Amino acid sequence: MTTAPSPPPAVTSARILRLWWPLAASWLLMGAELLLFTVFVARMPDPEVNLAAYGSIVFPISLVIEAPIIMFLAMSTALVADGDAYAKLHRMMLKAGVLLTVVHVLVAFTPLYDLVAGRVLKVPVEVMEPARIGLRIMTPWTFAIAYRRFHQGILIRFEESRAVVVGTAVRLVANVAVLSVGFAVGGIAGIVVGTCAVATAVVVEAVYVGWRVQPVLRERVRPAPVHGAPLTRSAFLSFYVPLAMTPLMMLVIQPIGAGAMSRMPNALASLAAWPAVHGFVFILRSVGMAFNEVVVTLIGEPGAVRALRRFCFAATAVVTGLILLVAFTPLSAFWFGTVSGLAPELASVACTALLFAVLMPGYTFLQSWYQGALVHSRRTRAVTEAVAIYGVVAVSLLTLGARWQAHTGIYFAITTFTIGGILQTAWLWWRSRGPMRALGPDSDSVPAAEVAWNGTSPAE
C-alpha cells in the first residue's frame, strides 16, 4: 500500500528566512572576496595600477566571458527535477564550460587581448601588462563557475542551501590563505597574488560542491520519475537563451563602463577606486540577488506570493537603510580609508562615489522578486527585455559622459548604472503583473519544473 507524499510546509516568513539566509550568506562571502582583493592589493607595491588592472580589465572581461553560464544556477533550480533532466543539462554544462574556457584562452593568450584592452577599452598604458598577466591566471575561472553554479542550483532546489554557504566559506578560506601567503612572501605583484587567490578559491569551491551534491543526486534526483514531458532541446533553448542573454548584456556593460571611465576626467583614480566601491555595494546587493532563487523555488506553493512579497519589501527597506547609514556618515571614510586601505585621495573618491549608489541594494531585491515570478512562469523573454532597456540606457549615457568630459568617471558611471537599474526594475514590475495575477495571493499552482514541456514558452 502506497501513501500520498506529504504536502510541503506552508510558505511562512520563517520558511523563507531558512531558505534565504544560507544563500544570502553565500553571496555575502562572495562579496567579501572582492573586498579582500582590495584590502590585500592596496597594501602591496604599486596598488593603484594593480587595482585598476583588476577593476578595469581582468574582472569585467572574465565576467563577460562567463556570462552565458551565470544563470545555470537558476536553470538547475527550476529544471533539474529528475535524472533525465539532470543528465541532459549536465552535458550542456560541460560543453558550455569547455567552449567558454577556450574563449578565455583566446582573449588572454593571443593578440585579441591588445585589441580588446588597448583599442576597444583604451585603458591606461601602465595597466595593460599587469592586467594581461592577471587575465591569464584566471583561465580556470569559467569552467569552475559553470560546474559550481549548476550543482548549487540542485542543492537549492532540494532545500539543501546550507551546503551552498559552506562551499562559499571554503572558497573564502582558500582565498585568504593564498592572499596571506603572497603578502607574507613579498615581492610578488598584487595582481598576481590576487588573481591566483581568486582562481584557486573558485576551483576549491567547485570541488566541494561537486562532492556535496552527490548524495542528493543519488537519493533524490536520479530515482525521481520524469515530471511532465521529457526535457527537449527546443524547450530548453526557449527557456534558457533569453535567461542567458540577461547576464551577458548586463555584464558587457562592465567593460564598457571601464572604457568610458578611461575616457573621463580622473581616469586612473576612478579605475582604482572602482573595485572597492563595487565590492562594498555588491555586499549589500548580494543579499537581494540571493532572493531570486528563493522566489523561483517557493512561489508556486500555496500562500507563497503574499509571504514572499512581504519579505521582499521589508528586506528592501533594511538594505536601503544600511547603505544610507554608511554613505552619509563618517562610516564611509572609515570603510574605504581604514578597512579597505585606500590612499587618502582614493578613499575620498570612493566615499563620494558611494553617494550615487544608495538606491542599488533596494532595487536589487525588487528585481529578484519580479524576475523570480517571471522565471517560474517561463516568461524569461521579459527578463531579457528589462536588461536590454538597462543596456541601452547605460551605453547611451556612458557614451555621452565620455564625450562630455565634465565629471569624474566613477561618479558618472555609477549614476548611469543606477538610472538604468531603476528603469530595468520598472519594466520587470510591468511584465510580472500577469504572472503575479495568475499565481494570486494564495496560489495553488504546481512547482515550475512540473509544468509539461511542449517546446515553447508561455504566451507573452
Where are these regions (language model features)?
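Short alpha-helical transmembrane segments in multi-pass integral membrane proteins
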Residues: 2-23, 77-141, 181-241, 299-359, ...
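Transmembrane helix-bundle signature of multi-pass secondary active exporters and lipid flippases
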Residues: 24-74, 241-297, 322-323, 357-364
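Hydrophobic/aromatic residues within transmembrane alpha-helices of membrane transport systems
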Residues: 25, 37-41, 54, 76, ...
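Hydrophobic/aromatic residues in alpha-helical transmembrane segments
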Residues: 37, 72-76, 113, 151, ...
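Alpha-helical transmembrane segments and their helix-entry boundary regions
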Residues: 51-52, 89, 152-153, 161-165, ...
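Small-residue-rich hydrophobic transmembrane alpha-helices
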Residues: 53-104, 148-152, 156, 273-323, ...
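Residue-level recognition of pore/gate-forming positions within transmembrane alpha-helices
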Residues: 59, 171-175, 198-206, 279-282, ...
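Alpha-helical transmembrane segments of multi-pass membrane transporters/permeases
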Residues: 154-180, 192, 301-316, 373-399
